Structure formats: structure tokens, C-alpha cells
Amino acid sequence: MGLSDGEWQLVLNVWGKVEADIPSHGQEVLISLFKGHPETLEKFDKFKHLKSEDEMKASEELKKHGATVLTALGGILKKKGQHEAELKPLAQSHATKHKIPVKYLEFISDAIVHVLQKKHPGDFGADAQGAMKKALELFRNDMAAKYKELGFQG
């Protein structure tokens, strides 16, 4: 299920747009995740009190965490599938400390695609969307495999 060089290029081209403003992209991704799947908010103690989209938009903590999430994901995407070193600590914390189910990784992947479609329609056509979905699926599958190694059935 690997990506071709051309597919990785499509992924990294649009990711360059994300990196130009990681905090606002991260904020939008988390808001999209929480709006589409309110149950995911329960995994974030510091955001549980944010009930409305306006409250979420006003939260500097949410923006900061969104930037952290997308910075980590960007580091993984740039490895073009050779992301074992980057993935291991992420899987460890998400499986043992945060207990984030694999399903939630699917939800945030969908939120990322949604935000990219909205913010960068000219740079995120069908081919780029397909490549990004494949890259995010590769990430999720590898996270799930690590979860299994760690004995987490998320």
C-alpha cells in the first residue's frame, strides 16, 4: 500500500501550504474533528469545557495543540513511509497515556482532508486528495500495528 514518488510529491506539495500557517490549520482540524465527532473531545481534558465553535476558535491552547499535532504529522509525512523512529514514541503515548482509539485517528484524518479541501481547493484536487488519503491510511495502519505490539486494543 505504499505511495509512488509522484503521490508523495503531491502530499508534500500541499503540506507546504499547511506549514505556511500550521497554527490556523491545526486549529481548524481540531475544530472539525470535535464538531464532526464530539465524543473525541472527551479525550482532551484541557478542551472538554469548550462547548461552542466560537469558544474553540478563541482558545489559544487549542490552536497550540493543533500546531503540535500537525507538526508531528508533517515530520512523519516527510519520511515518506520510513517513519518508524517518529511513529514509535507517538504510538507509545497515544496507546498507553492518552488511550486514543485507532478509529479517532481515522476521524482526524478525515478532518485533515476536509480542512485541506476547504483551504486549498486549487492545490488539493482529486489526485492530491487520493495521495493524502493513502498517506494518512499508511500512518493509521502503522499506528495500529504499534498499538497491537503495545497490547492496546484501541
UniProtKB/Swiss-Prot annotation:
Keyword check for Oxidoreductase: yes
Phosphothreonine modification, residue list: 68
Any one GO molecular function term: metal ion binding
Alphabetically ordered keywords of this record: Cytoplasm, Heme, Iron, Metal-binding, Muscle protein, Oxidoreductase, Oxygen transport, Phosphoprotein, Transport
Any GO BP annotation: removal of superoxide radicals
Positions with a binding annotation for heme b: 94
Role noted for this protein: Monomeric heme protein which primary function is to store oxygen and facilitate its diffusion within muscle tissues. Reversibly binds oxygen through a pentacoordinated heme iron and enables its timely and efficient release as needed during periods of heightened demand. Depending on the oxidative conditions of tissues and cells, and in addition to its ability to bind oxygen, it also has a nitrite reductase activity whereby it regulates the production of bioactive nitric oxide.
Listed name of the protein: Myoglobin
Gene designation: MB
